Amino acid sequence: MNHPADIPNALDLLRTVFGHPAFRGAQAEIVGHVAAGGDALVLMPTGGGKSLCYQLPALLRSGTALVVSPLIALMQDQVAALRQLGVRAALLNSTLSAEQAREVERALRQGERDLLYVAPERLMMPRMLDLLEGLIAPPIDLRGEPVVE
């Protein structure tokens, strides 16, 4: 385990937020490494627990984690599931009305979201780039490494 100091907090969140009694396989090592700011390429089968390897570190670190996902349905499912658990997650994609998108942007600027899911093509839009640029400056910290789901 690379970062044992992070693991007790991670294990507590794993149990209290996600409802899992223990990590599976290499999850503990990956979560500790990512929570400490490290990069990871995680290859696991469907249902193997990949999402937890970035969702949990997002809750351990300050700022907002950016999750890049090409599948709108996956974004919607993950954000809905995280919200059910009390996690401050949001998405920005073409399914939102202009008013809904503005509300997500406002919440991001106020530091009220832990995870933001976006489609890759949204990262090419000037409005999104301006939003992200504004989040990088203090007081809101947008974590530097996006996650691709």
Where are these regions (language model features)?
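Short, high-confidence coil segments that cap the C-terminus of an alpha-helix
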Residues: 37-40, 62, 112-113
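SF2 helicase catalytic motif II
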Residues: 114, 121-124, 128-149
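Short hydrophobic/charged patches on amphipathic alpha-helices used for structural packing
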Residues: 31, 55, 102-105, 129
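Conserved coil-to-alpha-helix start sites within the AMP-binding
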Residues: 48-53, 61, 72-77
